[in-house]
Amino acid sequence: MSLAVRPPVCLLCRSGAPTLLPSSVSQVARSMATARLRRKVARMALSPDVAKSSINQKRSGKAKFGPWSGMNQTEAHIRGEPRSRSQAALRRSGEKAADTPRKSDSPLYKALKMQTTLAPVPYGRRTAVKSKIADITSFDHFPLLPVVRHSIFSQALPGLVDVTPTPIQRLAIPKLMEDSPDGKRGTKLEDGDPQYDQYLLAAETGSGKTLAYLLPLVDAVKRLEVEDKENERKEEERKAKEKEERLKNRAFDLEPEEPPLSNAGRPRVIILVPTSELVAQVGVKVKALAHTVKYRSGMISSNLTPRRIKSTLFNPDGIDILVSTPHLLASIAKTEPYVLSRVSHLVLDEADSLMDRSFLPTTTEIISKVAPSLRKLILCSATIPRSLDNLLRKRYPDIKRLTTPNLHAIPRRVQLGVVDIQKEPYRGNRNLACADVIWSIGKAGDSEPSEPFASYVGPNIKKILVFVNEREEADEVAQFLRSKGIDAQSLSRDSSARKQEEILAEFTESAPPPSPEEIMLAQKKRRQEDAIPFELPENHNKPENVRRLANTKVLVTTDLASRGIDTLPVKTVILYHVPHTTIDFIHRLGRLGRMNKRGRGIVLVGKKDRKDVVKEVREGMFRGQALI
């Protein structure tokens, strides 16, 4: 029996021959490689360490000990004296286990890792904050002036019976009312570090952040008025004594009179917001408190005429609180540098936008100009991206971080539904699915009890917001909805300023309780409508070609209306597109659930949308956890 002799093969050829893998193995390898997700840029990612004042430096992943530790070294590490114990031995012994805990990936939110742009706050810290603020149940616990405390119930929150401070108000108001240890105006030290106090207010949407910083600011303005009057009295006495001494020495010399110092165009408090819409909203709240507290306020934006801006800012009576956008204020400060010479408090509302690439140079310029007189710098936002978190740790390492337990979480009273537009009867038609959802909501009855005077003044008007990702689609979607008998309007950057104000007023202002005269007029109008006339109009028998959805108003908008706008009358939000990031999810659904009211969000999911992301957002909302 003879054995088959294999042909001789060169060893060099055998080593150079490619290794053939089964097709299934190579396909799995390719799919795993393509499934790797690119890391999101810092401005689109939420920071994981918002509440931490400092972060420990991470260890280098390079092995210092082992069989390959001596390779690629640029320095000769010659062992001289014997070491007591190596780092590896210390790690094995567990002596440093408490100092360097090993991080473990949570199985929750696997799909959201591509959108992890928010900074998570440890739940231990959230629980500690919750227990800390549990004892504060009334605004009487805060050391506010009596006139400021009275304005909360009469002007800021009128018509509410049981008024209690929200978590961010319980945290922020006492801290913002604390004085600096030295009690001096803010200046810059020799090494460049700011001496003024810095605060970061981070809380969920609709939690009352505006009132949380506005009440301490108004209180500070009234206290500074008393302080300035005392300083003026002392200054007048000093000048009078100096004048008497000069007259005694030189009785016949004429001295020019000094012009009186005016506070026109020199505000004490400046509130910066990114958009003109927020200028109008915050300015209304500031002006409402001024009715009882008595201070001078104003708001300026690009929607106003130059004459109106000049008369507001340079009022001869002076101005105490100014609400503006950064670019407009910076342009005014270039020609009128004294505008920023008396600022003691500076607020950056929606700080994640104001510290972004588009606003950062202008915002930094304003901060540097007000630094000589600044006492407190307040940053306020509902989402803290990683880019903002890193910037604050670099520029303001000593900033006081005031974070609420529900930061980066959507309110529990908001329910999220999903509509698959690929199924029947839509077959991928997103416009048709949106119109069908709106008709279903409009024809359904209200789940919440109606207003006590609804039977007198007429039916309740349902307000619905529809968010799109591109502003070009806002007009197209609104036009399609109008063709289906829906009262829809569009709002984007292309809309005029007058139209923006009129539209936002319908979706932000809640109707006050009707007066007896309004009730009588409504009843009279209803009786006239129910009466049978002697002569019918000519077009009475002509049927309408299009069905109309009654008692429903729809606003199709972009992210222009997703940040800071207080849409209290809105109970339904439709996400026409799946948001790009977790930040957009939080801000768009944050238009609901304000002041502990119920809300409903509906997402239209198509073939190319991330259904796993929407699923995990729903799970996080059900558990009441942050979307990180």
From Swiss-Prot:
All copies of domain Helicase ATP-binding, residue ranges: 190-402
Give the originating organism: Aspergillus oryzae (strain ATCC 42149 / RIB 40) (Yellow koji mold)
Instruction: Write out the residues that bind ATP.
Output: 203-210
**Motif Q motif: which ranges?**
137-170
A Pfam family annotated for this UniProt entry? DEAD
Placement of sequence motif DEAD box: 349-352
UniProt free text on domains? The Q motif is unique to and characteristic of the DEAD box family of RNA helicases and controls ATP binding and hydrolysis.
Q: What does this protein do?
A: ATP-binding RNA helicase involved in mitochondrial RNA metabolism. Required for maintenance of mitochondrial DNA.
Q: Which reaction does it catalyse?
A: ATP + H2O = ADP + phosphate + H(+)
Q: What is an example of a GO molecular function annotated in this UniProt entry?
A: RNA binding
By what name is this protein known? ATP-dependent RNA helicase mrh4, mitochondrial
Q: Does the keyword Transmembrane helix apply?
A: no
Which PROSITE patterns does its entry note?
HELICASE_ATP_BIND_1, HELICASE_CTER, Q_MOTIF
Note whether Thylakoid occurs among the keywords. no
